[in-house]
A protein has these predicted regions:
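Mature, solvent-exposed C-terminal subdomains and processed small-chain segments of exported/organellar
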Residues: 1-304
Length: 304
C-alpha cells in the first residue's frame, strides 16, 4: 500500500479509478496475467480507498500461491516494474474515455436503489460534493486532466511503500497488545531496496482499447405487452432454441442461455468431478478474453 494525497475533490477526473483500472486489469499482458503464468498468484485487486479530504491510501492486494509466497520479494520487484511502465507511458486517454462511456450507460440503465438507502447515500454525498453531483458521483465525469493521474502515480515509490505479508506459518517476533496477534515488523535495508530496484524488464502491456465498449446504444421501439411467450425457432432431435423479446424492462442487453443434457448413465461421480475441473479450466483459460468483455457490461457463466 501507498499513502497518497486525498483525491476526493478530483471526482470529475477520477484518476484513482483509472489507476486501479490499469493495475487491476486482467487482460493479455497485464500484471496478473504474468503472475499467473509464473504460478505465483491467483487474483489481484488494485484501488484507492478514500479516507479523508487530505489523504487516501492506495492498495495492491495479491492472492499468492504457495510458490508465490516463497517468491514474494520477486513479486514486489515485478509489480514495481509494471508501475515503472505505467509512469513511462503516462496518462491513457482511451482508458479515461472507456470509463466515462460505461459510467454514462450505467447512470441511465443501472438500478440506482430506492428508499432509505438511496436517501442516505445522497445525504452523505451532499456533505462532500457539489449539490448538482450528489447521488451521481460514480457517474459524473468532466474533462480529463492527465496531470492529476501522473501526480497520483508519482507516490507509488519504494520509499512510500508498506508491504503486508499474511500467511500461515510465518515466523514472528512480536505480539499485539490487545488481541495478542503474532506479527513482525522491519524496515527495508539497502540490500532489500536494491533487490527491488534492479529488476530486468518484463513483457508487460498496458490495457489496449477495448473493442467491446459500445460506441452507441439503441433500443428498438417496443410496446409494453403482457403474456408474451418465447418463440420456438429450432426444434429437432438434438436442439431446441427459443427466442423471447423483452417488452418490459427495455434495457440494451440480451441473454443467451445454453443447456446441454447428458444421459444419466454417462454421468458417474467421477465424470462429474472431471466436469467441474474442466469448467474451472475453461474459466481460467477464457479470463484474458472475458475480462475486457466484463468491463463492457458483458458476461458469461458456465456451471453444471
Amino acid at each position: 500500500s501507498y499513502f497518497v494525497p486525498g483525491v476526493r475533490l478530483q471526482y470529475l477526473q477520477k484518476p484513482s479509478r483509472q489507476l486501479g483500472f490499469i493495475l487491476g486489469h486482467q487482460g493479455e499482458g497485464s500484471l496478473l496475467s504474468y503472475l499467473k503464468n509464473q504460478g505465483w498468484a491467483t487474483s489481484l485487486y488494485a484501488g484507492i480507498r478514500s479516507e479523508t479530504k487530505e489523504y487516501d491510501y492506495a492498495q495492491i492486494s495479491i492472492e499468492l500461491t504457495e510458490k508465490g509466497l516463497e517468491e514474494y520479494q520477486e513479486i514486489l520487484g515485478v509489480t514495481h516494474s509494471y508501475i515503472k511502465l505505467m509512469k513511462k507511458a503516462g496518462f491513457q486517454e482511451h482508458v479515461f474515455d472507456e470509463l466515462k462511456t460505461m459510467a454514462s450507460l450505467e447512470e441511465v440503465y443501472s438500478n440506482k436503489g430506492e428508499g432509505a438507502r438511496r436517501a442516505e447515500n445522497i445525504a452523505n454525498e451532499l456533505n462532500m460534493y457539489n449539490f448538482k453531483d450528489a447521488g451521481r458521483i460514480n457517474y459524473a465525469y468532466g474533462d480529463p486532466k492527465p496531470e492529476n493521474f501522473d501526480s497520483l502515480l508519482s507516490y507509488f515509490t519504494l520509499e512510500n511503500m508498506l508491504v503486508l505479508l499474511s500467511a500461515k506459518g510465518l515466523k514472528t517476533d512480536k505480539e499485539e497488545y490487545h488481541y495478542k496477534t503474532k506479527y513482525s515488523y522491519f524496515e527495508n535495508d539497502s540490500l532489500y531496496l536494491a533487490l527491488l530496484r534492479d529488476k530486468p524488464s518484463h513483457t508487460f502491456e498496458l490495457p489496449k482499447p477495448n473493442s467491446f465498449i459500445p460506441k452507441k446504444v439503441k433500443i428498438p421501439n417496443r410496446e409494453i405487452k403482457d403474456n408474451i411467450k418465447p418463440r420456438l425457432l429450432i426444434n429437432n432431435k438434438n436442439t431446441k432454441i427459443y427466442f423471447a423479446k423483452d417488452h418490459e424492462f427495455l434495457r440494451p442487453k440480451g441473454v443467451i442461455s445454453y443447456k446441454i443434457l447428458f444421459p444419466k448413465n454417462k454421468m458417474s461421480a467421477q465424470h462429474r468431478a472431471f466436469l467441474k475441473i474442466y469448467i474451472e479450466c475453461v474459466r481460467e483459460s477464457m479470463n484474458e478474453v472475458a475480462f475486457p468483455a466484463r468491463l463492457a457490461g458483458l458476461s458469461y457463466s458456465l456451471f453444471d
